[in-house]
Amino acid sequence: MRRRMFLSRSSILAGVGLLALAGCEPPWRSRGEGPDASTSAASGGAGSGSASASASGSAGASGGSGQGVTRTVTTVGATLEVTVGPAVVSDDVMVVPLVVHLVKAGSSSPSTPGFSPHLVWNGTGSFTGADGVRLVDFDAGTVQETFKASSESTGLSEEEPDATLHALFKPVDAKTINVLVPESGLFEGVPVVRDGKLSDEAKKALEYVNTTENTPDPVALETFTASVDGASDTRVADKSVVINLASDVLFASDSADLSSQADATLKKAADQLATYPGGEVSIVGHTDDVADDAHNLDLSKRRATSVSDRLGQLTNMSAFSVSTDGKGESTPRVPNDSDGNRQLNRRVEITLVPTQAASSTSSPDASKGTGQGGGDLPQAEGPVAKGSEGVTVTRGNSEDKMTFVLTEVTRRGTYLVGEVKATGGTGGTQTGPADWLQPTQLDGSARGEEDNNLLGAVTGLSLLTPQTRYYPVDYTVAEGTHHPLSEITANNKLTAGDATTLTVVWPDTGQDTVTLDLQPAEHSTPSPN
Protein backbone atom coordinates (compact mmCIF):
# COMPACT_ATOMS: atom_id res chain seq x y z
CA MET A 1 0.00 0.00 0.00
CA ARG A 2 2.20 2.79 -1.24
CA ARG A 3 1.41 5.93 -3.17
CA ARG A 4 3.94 7.77 -5.19
CA MET A 5 4.29 11.10 -7.05
CA PHE A 6 7.06 12.19 -9.40
CA LEU A 7 7.96 15.71 -10.39
CA SER A 8 10.58 16.95 -12.81
CA ARG A 9 12.44 20.08 -11.77
CA SER A 10 15.36 22.35 -12.33
CA SER A 11 15.12 25.61 -10.40
CA ILE A 12 11.37 25.39 -9.95
CA LEU A 13 9.24 22.32 -10.15
CA ALA A 14 5.61 22.83 -10.98
CA GLY A 15 3.17 20.07 -10.42
CA VAL A 16 2.94 17.93 -13.42
CA GLY A 17 4.21 15.04 -11.36
CA LEU A 18 3.24 11.44 -11.09
CA LEU A 19 1.35 10.20 -8.10
CA ALA A 20 0.91 6.58 -7.19
CA LEU A 21 -1.45 5.59 -4.45
CA ALA A 22 -1.66 2.21 -2.98
CA GLY A 23 -5.05 0.82 -3.26
CA CYS A 24 -6.88 0.90 0.00
CA GLU A 25 -4.85 2.79 2.56
CA PRO A 26 -2.32 5.57 2.54
CA PRO A 27 0.91 4.67 1.12
CA TRP A 28 1.54 6.09 -2.33
CA ARG A 29 3.97 7.50 -4.84
CA SER A 30 4.00 10.25 -7.46
CA ARG A 31 6.30 11.71 -10.10
CA GLY A 32 6.25 13.76 -13.28
CA GLU A 33 7.77 16.11 -15.80
CA GLY A 34 7.75 19.81 -14.91
CA PRO A 35 8.20 22.96 -17.00
CA ASP A 36 11.45 24.70 -17.73
CA ALA A 37 12.64 26.90 -14.87
CA SER A 38 12.29 30.05 -16.95
CA THR A 39 8.57 29.59 -17.45
CA SER A 40 5.63 30.05 -15.15
CA ALA A 41 3.18 27.27 -14.50
CA ALA A 42 -0.42 27.22 -13.46
CA SER A 43 -1.28 24.51 -11.03
CA GLY A 44 -4.46 23.31 -9.48
CA GLY A 45 -6.19 20.24 -8.22
CA ALA A 46 -9.61 18.94 -7.52
CA GLY A 47 -11.36 21.44 -5.35
CA SER A 48 -8.16 23.41 -4.89
CA GLY A 49 -8.91 26.50 -6.92
CA SER A 50 -5.85 27.81 -8.69
CA ALA A 51 -2.44 29.15 -7.86
CA SER A 52 0.50 30.31 -9.90
CA ALA A 53 4.23 29.77 -9.61
CA SER A 54 7.12 31.66 -11.11
CA ALA A 55 10.78 30.75 -11.35
CA SER A 56 11.45 32.91 -8.33
CA GLY A 57 9.44 30.65 -6.07
CA SER A 58 6.65 32.26 -4.01
CA ALA A 59 3.71 30.54 -5.65
CA GLY A 60 0.94 33.04 -6.22
CA ALA A 61 2.77 35.58 -4.06
CA SER A 62 3.04 39.26 -4.82
CA GLY A 63 4.71 42.05 -2.97
CA GLY A 64 7.31 44.77 -3.18
CA SER A 65 9.52 46.94 -1.06
CA GLY A 66 7.61 47.87 2.07
CA GLN A 67 4.59 45.85 1.02
CA GLY A 68 3.26 42.60 2.36
CA VAL A 69 3.28 39.40 0.33
CA THR A 70 -0.12 38.25 -0.92
CA ARG A 71 -1.31 34.80 -1.92
CA THR A 72 -4.71 33.36 -2.74
CA VAL A 73 -4.78 30.01 -0.98
CA THR A 74 -7.07 27.13 -0.15
CA THR A 75 -7.21 26.42 3.58
CA VAL A 76 -9.48 23.73 5.05
CA GLY A 77 -12.04 24.20 2.29
CA ALA A 78 -12.05 28.01 2.27
CA THR A 79 -10.53 30.20 -0.43
CA LEU A 80 -8.58 33.00 1.24
CA GLU A 81 -6.59 36.01 0.12
CA VAL A 82 -3.82 36.30 2.68
CA THR A 83 -1.33 39.16 2.94
CA VAL A 84 1.61 38.62 5.28
CA GLY A 85 3.62 41.61 6.47
CA PRO A 86 5.34 43.91 6.46
CA ALA A 87 6.85 42.70 9.72
CA VAL A 88 7.48 45.48 12.24
CA VAL A 89 10.21 45.39 14.89
CA SER A 90 9.23 47.16 18.10
CA ASP A 91 11.53 46.82 21.11
CA ASP A 92 11.89 43.08 21.89
CA VAL A 93 9.21 41.81 19.53
CA MET A 94 8.75 41.49 15.78
CA VAL A 95 5.09 41.63 14.83
CA VAL A 96 4.08 39.83 11.64
CA PRO A 97 0.53 40.79 10.61
CA LEU A 98 -1.58 38.33 8.63
CA VAL A 99 -4.41 40.12 6.85
CA VAL A 100 -6.99 37.64 5.60
CA HIS A 101 -9.96 38.11 3.29
CA LEU A 102 -12.53 35.36 2.84
CA VAL A 103 -13.09 34.88 -0.90
CA LYS A 104 -15.24 31.78 -0.59
CA ALA A 105 -16.24 29.70 2.40
CA GLY A 106 -16.06 25.94 2.28
CA SER A 107 -17.95 23.49 4.43
CA SER A 108 -14.93 21.98 6.21
CA SER A 109 -14.09 24.89 8.48
CA PRO A 110 -13.96 24.09 12.19
CA SER A 111 -16.40 26.96 12.62
CA THR A 112 -18.77 26.61 9.67
CA PRO A 113 -20.52 28.55 8.30
CA GLY A 114 -17.70 30.93 7.43
CA PHE A 115 -14.10 30.41 8.44
CA SER A 116 -12.03 31.00 11.57
CA PRO A 117 -8.30 31.22 10.72
CA HIS A 118 -7.30 31.35 14.39
CA LEU A 119 -8.41 27.72 14.74
CA VAL A 120 -6.10 26.64 11.89
CA TRP A 121 -3.09 28.91 12.48
CA ASN A 122 -2.85 28.55 16.26
CA GLY A 123 -0.25 25.77 16.49
CA THR A 124 -0.17 23.11 19.19
CA GLY A 125 -0.60 25.35 22.23
CA SER A 126 -3.79 26.24 24.04
CA PHE A 127 -3.90 29.71 22.48
CA THR A 128 -6.05 31.15 19.71
CA GLY A 129 -4.39 33.22 17.03
CA ALA A 130 -1.34 32.72 14.81
CA ASP A 131 0.94 30.86 17.21
CA GLY A 132 1.61 28.13 14.62
CA VAL A 133 3.28 30.45 12.10
CA ARG A 134 7.05 29.90 11.62
CA LEU A 135 9.97 31.73 10.00
CA VAL A 136 12.33 29.87 7.65
CA ASP A 137 15.81 31.04 6.62
CA PHE A 138 16.92 28.79 3.77
CA ASP A 139 20.35 30.42 3.47
CA ALA A 140 21.18 29.93 7.15
CA GLY A 141 19.31 26.62 7.35
CA THR A 142 17.23 27.65 10.37
CA VAL A 143 13.63 27.83 11.54
CA GLN A 144 12.11 30.06 14.21
CA GLU A 145 8.86 29.67 16.13
CA THR A 146 6.80 32.37 17.84
CA PHE A 147 7.79 33.34 21.37
CA LYS A 148 4.58 35.07 22.40
CA ALA A 149 0.98 34.29 21.56
CA SER A 150 -1.79 36.83 21.24
CA SER A 151 -5.23 35.37 21.89
CA GLU A 152 -7.06 36.63 18.82
CA SER A 153 -10.35 35.10 17.70
CA THR A 154 -11.60 35.69 14.18
CA GLY A 155 -14.80 34.60 12.50
CA LEU A 156 -14.98 35.32 8.78
CA SER A 157 -18.29 35.33 6.92
CA GLU A 158 -19.86 36.83 3.80
CA GLU A 159 -21.01 39.75 5.93
CA GLU A 160 -17.64 40.22 7.66
CA PRO A 161 -14.99 38.72 5.34
CA ASP A 162 -11.91 40.52 6.68
CA ALA A 163 -9.70 40.11 9.73
CA THR A 164 -6.10 40.51 10.89
CA LEU A 165 -4.07 38.20 13.12
CA HIS A 166 -0.55 38.75 14.43
CA ALA A 167 2.35 36.32 14.82
CA LEU A 168 4.89 37.47 17.41
CA PHE A 169 8.59 36.61 17.03
CA LYS A 170 11.91 37.62 18.48
CA PRO A 171 13.42 40.23 16.12
CA VAL A 172 15.73 39.12 13.31
CA ASP A 173 18.50 41.06 11.56
CA ALA A 174 17.33 40.25 8.03
CA LYS A 175 15.68 42.75 5.68
CA THR A 176 13.14 40.16 4.57
CA ILE A 177 11.76 36.95 6.05
CA ASN A 178 10.07 33.80 4.77
CA VAL A 179 6.85 33.03 6.64
CA LEU A 180 5.31 29.55 6.73
CA VAL A 181 1.59 29.74 7.52
CA PRO A 182 -0.25 26.54 8.55
CA GLU A 183 -2.19 25.04 5.62
CA SER A 184 -1.75 28.27 3.68
CA GLY A 185 1.74 27.97 2.22
CA LEU A 186 5.07 29.78 2.27
CA PHE A 187 5.18 33.57 1.95
CA GLU A 188 8.67 34.52 0.76
CA GLY A 189 10.43 37.86 0.93
CA VAL A 190 8.20 39.53 3.51
CA PRO A 191 9.77 42.96 4.28
CA VAL A 192 10.96 43.80 7.79
CA VAL A 193 10.41 47.40 8.94
CA ARG A 194 12.41 48.69 11.92
CA ASP A 195 10.70 51.97 12.66
CA GLY A 196 8.74 50.51 15.55
CA LYS A 197 5.48 52.00 14.30
CA LEU A 198 2.79 49.47 15.11
CA SER A 199 -0.76 49.62 13.83
CA ASP A 200 -3.57 50.06 16.32
CA GLU A 201 -4.52 46.42 15.73
CA ALA A 202 -0.97 45.28 16.52
CA LYS A 203 -0.87 47.37 19.68
CA LYS A 204 -4.14 45.81 20.78
CA ALA A 205 -2.78 42.33 20.06
CA LEU A 206 0.24 43.02 22.28
CA GLU A 207 -1.97 43.99 25.22
CA TYR A 208 -2.96 40.38 25.85
CA VAL A 209 -0.06 38.04 25.19
CA ASN A 210 1.30 34.86 26.74
CA THR A 211 4.78 33.40 26.56
CA THR A 212 4.66 30.18 24.56
CA GLU A 213 6.50 26.92 25.10
CA ASN A 214 7.82 27.14 21.56
CA THR A 215 11.39 27.35 20.26
CA PRO A 216 11.70 31.14 19.83
CA ASP A 217 15.35 31.40 18.79
CA PRO A 218 16.52 30.31 15.33
CA VAL A 219 17.36 26.61 15.43
CA ALA A 220 19.25 24.60 12.82
CA LEU A 221 17.38 22.45 10.36
CA GLU A 222 18.44 18.80 10.35
CA THR A 223 18.00 16.01 7.83
CA PHE A 224 16.83 12.48 8.40
CA THR A 225 17.20 9.90 5.65
CA ALA A 226 16.76 6.15 5.52
CA SER A 227 18.11 3.59 3.09
CA VAL A 228 15.44 2.14 0.86
CA ASP A 229 16.36 -1.37 1.96
CA GLY A 230 15.80 -0.44 5.61
CA ALA A 231 19.39 -1.29 6.54
CA SER A 232 20.37 2.18 7.78
CA ASP A 233 19.27 5.72 8.44
CA THR A 234 21.22 8.95 8.79
CA ARG A 235 20.67 12.10 10.85
CA VAL A 236 22.65 15.19 9.85
CA ALA A 237 22.61 17.88 12.54
CA ASP A 238 24.47 21.15 12.90
CA LYS A 239 27.66 19.63 14.35
CA SER A 240 27.35 15.88 13.95
CA VAL A 241 26.30 13.05 11.66
CA VAL A 242 24.72 9.90 13.09
CA ILE A 243 24.46 6.76 10.97
CA ASN A 244 22.34 3.95 12.41
CA LEU A 245 23.00 0.50 10.99
CA ALA A 246 20.39 -2.21 11.51
CA SER A 247 21.90 -5.14 13.38
CA ASP A 248 19.46 -7.53 11.74
CA VAL A 249 21.19 -6.82 8.41
CA LEU A 250 24.73 -6.89 9.78
CA PHE A 251 24.56 -9.93 12.06
CA ALA A 252 22.76 -13.18 12.66
CA SER A 253 20.83 -13.44 15.91
CA ASP A 254 23.10 -13.38 18.99
CA SER A 255 26.22 -13.12 16.83
CA ALA A 256 28.96 -10.53 16.38
CA ASP A 257 30.18 -12.05 13.11
CA LEU A 258 29.28 -9.92 10.10
CA SER A 259 26.81 -11.49 7.70
CA SER A 260 27.28 -11.91 3.97
CA GLN A 261 24.94 -8.95 3.41
CA ALA A 262 26.78 -6.61 5.77
CA ASP A 263 29.30 -5.27 3.28
CA ALA A 264 26.69 -3.53 1.13
CA THR A 265 25.46 -1.54 4.13
CA LEU A 266 28.93 -0.89 5.54
CA LYS A 267 30.21 0.29 2.15
CA LYS A 268 27.47 2.95 2.07
CA ALA A 269 28.46 4.07 5.57
CA ALA A 270 32.11 4.16 4.54
CA ASP A 271 31.24 6.27 1.50
CA GLN A 272 29.38 8.72 3.74
CA LEU A 273 32.36 9.05 6.08
CA ALA A 274 34.70 9.49 3.12
CA THR A 275 32.96 12.75 2.16
CA TYR A 276 34.40 14.35 5.32
CA PRO A 277 38.08 15.33 5.64
CA GLY A 278 38.37 14.00 9.18
CA GLY A 279 36.96 14.13 12.68
CA GLU A 280 36.02 12.01 15.66
CA VAL A 281 34.10 8.79 15.03
CA SER A 282 32.45 6.77 17.77
CA ILE A 283 30.96 3.36 16.96
CA VAL A 284 28.51 2.08 19.57
CA GLY A 285 26.55 -1.16 19.60
CA HIS A 286 23.01 -1.45 20.99
CA THR A 287 20.64 -4.37 21.58
CA ASP A 288 17.02 -4.85 22.54
CA ASP A 289 15.95 -6.02 26.00
CA VAL A 290 15.85 -9.74 25.22
CA ALA A 291 18.46 -11.71 27.27
CA ASP A 292 20.15 -10.35 30.40
CA ASP A 293 22.01 -7.06 30.76
CA ALA A 294 25.51 -8.53 30.93
CA HIS A 295 25.01 -10.66 27.81
CA ASN A 296 23.60 -7.74 25.83
CA LEU A 297 26.39 -5.41 26.92
CA ASP A 298 29.06 -7.86 25.81
CA LEU A 299 27.30 -8.55 22.51
CA SER A 300 26.93 -4.85 21.73
CA LYS A 301 30.62 -4.19 22.36
CA ARG A 302 31.73 -7.06 20.13
CA ARG A 303 29.42 -5.90 17.35
CA ALA A 304 30.82 -2.38 17.51
CA THR A 305 34.34 -3.75 17.19
CA SER A 306 33.35 -5.88 14.18
CA VAL A 307 31.88 -2.86 12.42
CA SER A 308 34.92 -0.70 13.20
CA ASP A 309 37.34 -3.32 11.91
CA ARG A 310 35.45 -3.78 8.66
CA LEU A 311 35.05 -0.04 8.03
CA GLY A 312 38.81 0.29 8.35
CA GLN A 313 39.18 -2.29 5.60
CA LEU A 314 36.60 -0.65 3.32
CA THR A 315 37.92 2.92 3.52
CA ASN A 316 40.93 4.84 4.79
CA MET A 317 40.06 5.89 8.36
CA SER A 318 43.46 7.42 9.15
CA ALA A 319 42.01 10.95 9.21
CA PHE A 320 39.54 9.97 11.92
CA SER A 321 39.93 9.34 15.62
CA VAL A 322 37.90 6.15 16.11
CA SER A 323 36.51 4.71 19.34
CA THR A 324 34.20 1.76 19.98
CA ASP A 325 31.82 0.92 22.79
CA GLY A 326 28.65 -0.97 23.58
CA LYS A 327 25.59 0.09 25.53
CA GLY A 328 23.63 -3.14 25.50
CA GLU A 329 19.96 -2.43 26.13
CA SER A 330 20.56 0.69 28.26
CA THR A 331 19.84 3.34 25.61
CA PRO A 332 16.94 2.21 23.44
CA ARG A 333 15.97 4.32 20.48
CA VAL A 334 12.29 3.64 21.13
CA PRO A 335 10.51 1.69 23.89
CA ASN A 336 11.06 -2.07 23.73
CA ASP A 337 7.31 -2.71 23.66
CA SER A 338 6.85 -4.39 20.28
CA ASP A 339 8.77 -6.55 17.82
CA GLY A 340 9.07 -3.59 15.45
CA ASN A 341 10.51 -1.34 18.15
CA ARG A 342 12.95 -4.00 19.31
CA GLN A 343 14.15 -4.25 15.74
CA LEU A 344 14.83 -0.50 15.69
CA ASN A 345 16.78 -0.77 18.94
CA ARG A 346 19.07 -3.50 17.59
CA ARG A 347 21.60 -1.29 15.90
CA VAL A 348 25.18 -0.09 15.61
CA GLU A 349 25.38 3.68 15.79
CA ILE A 350 28.20 5.59 14.09
CA THR A 351 28.54 9.19 15.25
CA LEU A 352 30.85 11.55 13.40
CA VAL A 353 31.86 14.97 14.66
CA PRO A 354 33.66 16.30 11.58
CA THR A 355 36.50 18.79 11.55
CA GLN A 356 34.74 20.63 8.74
CA ALA A 357 31.81 20.23 6.37
CA ALA A 358 31.57 17.41 3.88
CA SER A 359 33.32 17.86 0.56
CA SER A 360 30.02 17.06 -1.16
CA THR A 361 26.44 17.55 0.00
CA SER A 362 24.90 15.77 -2.96
CA SER A 363 22.73 12.74 -2.52
CA PRO A 364 23.99 9.32 -3.69
CA ASP A 365 21.74 9.77 -6.73
CA ALA A 366 22.52 13.41 -7.48
CA SER A 367 24.69 12.66 -10.48
CA LYS A 368 22.00 10.53 -12.03
CA GLY A 369 19.96 13.53 -13.18
CA THR A 370 16.56 11.96 -13.55
CA GLY A 371 16.86 10.06 -10.33
CA GLN A 372 16.44 6.78 -12.13
CA GLY A 373 20.13 5.95 -12.21
CA GLY A 374 21.95 3.82 -9.68
CA GLY A 375 19.19 1.23 -9.76
CA ASP A 376 15.44 1.29 -9.97
CA LEU A 377 12.98 2.75 -7.55
CA PRO A 378 11.22 0.21 -5.35
CA GLN A 379 8.12 -1.19 -6.97
CA ALA A 380 5.07 0.89 -6.11
CA GLU A 381 2.37 -1.14 -4.42
CA GLY A 382 -0.39 1.00 -5.87
CA PRO A 383 -1.28 3.03 -8.96
CA VAL A 384 1.09 5.67 -10.32
CA ALA A 385 -0.05 9.04 -11.67
CA LYS A 386 1.33 12.47 -12.48
CA GLY A 387 1.48 14.77 -9.50
CA SER A 388 -0.71 17.33 -11.27
CA GLU A 389 -3.35 14.66 -11.82
CA GLY A 390 -3.33 13.41 -8.27
CA VAL A 391 -4.12 10.10 -6.66
CA THR A 392 -7.23 9.18 -4.73
CA VAL A 393 -6.78 6.99 -1.67
CA THR A 394 -9.39 4.87 0.07
CA ARG A 395 -8.82 3.93 3.69
CA GLY A 396 -9.36 0.29 4.53
CA ASN A 397 -12.84 -1.00 3.77
CA SER A 398 -14.46 2.37 4.44
CA GLU A 399 -15.68 4.91 1.91
CA ASP A 400 -13.30 7.49 3.38
CA LYS A 401 -11.40 8.96 0.41
CA MET A 402 -8.91 11.74 -0.15
CA THR A 403 -7.15 12.99 -3.28
CA PHE A 404 -3.56 14.27 -3.14
CA VAL A 405 -2.15 16.52 -5.86
CA LEU A 406 1.48 17.62 -5.99
CA THR A 407 1.14 21.19 -7.24
CA GLU A 408 4.65 22.59 -6.93
CA VAL A 409 8.19 21.87 -5.81
CA THR A 410 10.71 24.71 -5.67
CA ARG A 411 14.42 24.63 -4.88
CA ARG A 412 15.50 27.03 -2.17
CA GLY A 413 19.23 26.79 -1.51
CA THR A 414 19.87 23.22 -0.38
CA TYR A 415 16.17 22.55 0.23
CA LEU A 416 13.09 21.64 -1.77
CA VAL A 417 9.77 23.26 -0.87
CA GLY A 418 6.72 21.28 -1.94
CA GLU A 419 3.02 22.01 -1.90
CA VAL A 420 0.44 19.23 -1.84
CA LYS A 421 -3.29 19.81 -2.20
CA ALA A 422 -5.44 17.40 -0.19
CA THR A 423 -9.09 17.17 -1.25
CA GLY A 424 -11.93 15.33 0.45
CA GLY A 425 -13.57 12.62 -1.62
CA THR A 426 -17.22 11.72 -2.03
CA GLY A 427 -18.79 11.74 1.39
CA GLY A 428 -15.84 13.62 2.88
CA THR A 429 -13.22 12.31 5.28
CA GLN A 430 -13.48 11.04 8.81
CA THR A 431 -10.03 12.38 9.74
CA GLY A 432 -7.72 15.20 8.68
CA PRO A 433 -4.94 14.86 6.06
CA ALA A 434 -2.22 14.29 8.67
CA ASP A 435 -3.78 11.01 9.71
CA TRP A 436 -3.16 9.77 6.17
CA LEU A 437 0.37 11.15 5.88
CA GLN A 438 2.24 9.92 8.94
CA PRO A 439 4.91 7.22 8.94
CA THR A 440 3.27 3.84 8.79
CA GLN A 441 6.00 2.08 10.77
CA LEU A 442 6.73 4.60 13.51
CA ASP A 443 4.70 6.55 16.06
CA GLY A 444 5.35 10.27 16.39
CA SER A 445 8.15 11.67 14.25
CA ALA A 446 9.72 9.94 11.28
CA ARG A 447 12.70 9.30 13.57
CA GLY A 448 10.54 7.18 15.86
CA GLU A 449 10.29 9.73 18.66
CA GLU A 450 7.06 9.84 20.62
CA ASP A 451 5.54 13.31 20.75
CA ASN A 452 1.86 14.01 21.31
CA ASN A 453 2.28 17.38 19.61
CA LEU A 454 2.82 15.52 16.34
CA LEU A 455 -0.49 13.67 16.33
CA GLY A 456 -1.73 16.09 13.66
CA ALA A 457 1.58 16.50 11.80
CA VAL A 458 2.52 15.56 8.25
CA THR A 459 5.62 13.50 8.99
CA GLY A 460 5.64 10.63 6.51
CA LEU A 461 5.79 12.21 3.05
CA SER A 462 9.24 11.40 1.71
CA LEU A 463 11.22 11.96 -1.46
CA LEU A 464 12.40 8.64 -2.83
CA THR A 465 15.53 7.79 -4.81
CA PRO A 466 16.75 4.32 -5.76
CA GLN A 467 18.95 4.26 -2.66
CA THR A 468 17.51 6.71 -0.16
CA ARG A 469 14.28 7.96 1.39
CA TYR A 470 14.43 11.67 2.34
CA TYR A 471 12.01 12.68 5.08
CA PRO A 472 10.97 16.31 5.72
CA VAL A 473 13.75 18.35 7.30
CA ASP A 474 13.18 18.84 11.01
CA TYR A 475 14.51 20.67 14.04
CA THR A 476 14.88 20.17 17.78
CA VAL A 477 12.14 21.77 19.87
CA ALA A 478 12.18 22.74 23.54
CA GLU A 479 10.98 19.29 24.62
CA GLY A 480 13.99 17.65 22.94
CA THR A 481 12.09 15.90 20.15
CA HIS A 482 12.13 16.86 16.48
CA HIS A 483 9.35 18.66 14.64
CA PRO A 484 9.17 18.49 10.84
CA LEU A 485 9.20 21.58 8.65
CA SER A 486 5.78 20.63 7.36
CA GLU A 487 2.25 20.92 8.67
CA ILE A 488 2.02 20.34 12.44
CA THR A 489 -1.76 20.49 12.95
CA ALA A 490 -3.37 19.33 9.69
CA ASN A 491 -6.12 17.49 11.51
CA ASN A 492 -9.32 19.12 10.23
CA LYS A 493 -11.72 16.87 8.33
CA LEU A 494 -12.45 17.72 4.70
CA THR A 495 -15.94 17.49 3.27
CA ALA A 496 -16.49 16.35 -0.32
CA GLY A 497 -14.65 18.62 -2.75
CA ASP A 498 -13.06 20.77 -0.07
CA ALA A 499 -9.27 21.10 -0.20
CA THR A 500 -6.41 22.34 1.92
CA THR A 501 -2.77 23.30 1.26
CA LEU A 502 0.03 21.21 2.77
CA THR A 503 3.59 22.54 2.67
CA VAL A 504 6.57 20.23 3.14
CA VAL A 505 10.30 21.07 3.05
CA TRP A 506 12.84 18.36 2.19
CA PRO A 507 16.61 18.33 1.69
CA ASP A 508 17.56 18.76 -1.96
CA THR A 509 18.10 15.33 -3.51
CA GLY A 510 20.18 16.88 -6.29
CA GLN A 511 18.12 15.31 -9.07
CA ASP A 512 16.14 16.48 -12.08
CA THR A 513 13.13 14.41 -11.05
CA VAL A 514 11.73 13.94 -7.57
CA THR A 515 9.53 11.09 -6.42
CA LEU A 516 7.06 11.72 -3.61
CA ASP A 517 6.26 8.58 -1.67
CA LEU A 518 4.45 7.38 1.42
CA GLN A 519 5.86 4.06 2.53
CA PRO A 520 3.61 1.11 3.37
CA ALA A 521 3.21 -0.52 6.73
CA GLU A 522 5.49 -3.51 7.11
CA HIS A 523 4.71 -6.34 9.43
CA SER A 524 7.57 -8.57 10.46
CA THR A 525 8.69 -10.56 13.46
CA PRO A 526 12.46 -10.08 13.54
CA SER A 527 14.76 -12.26 15.59
CA PRO A 528 15.92 -10.99 19.01
CA ASN A 529 19.23 -9.16 19.59
Report the location of each language-model feature:
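N-terminal export leaders
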Residues: 3-12
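C-terminal motif of bacterial Sec signal peptides marking the signal peptidase cleavage site
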Residues: 21-23
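Short, low-complexity, disordered segments immediately C-terminal to signal peptides
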Residues: 25-61
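Surface-exposed edge beta-strand/loop patches
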Residues: 27, 67-69, 155-220, 354, ...
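Short, well-ordered beta-strand segments enriched in hydrophobic/aromatic residues
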Residues: 94-102, 416-424
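The feature marks short-to-medium sequence segments in extracytoplasmic or secretory-pathway proteins
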Residues: 103-158, 268, 272, 412, ...
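Periplasmic peptidoglycan-binding/anchoring modules of Gram-negative envelope and division proteins
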Residues: 227-239, 250-284, 308, 312-313, ...
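Periplasmic OmpA-like peptidoglycan-binding domain that tethers envelope proteins to the cell wall
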Residues: 286-364, 370
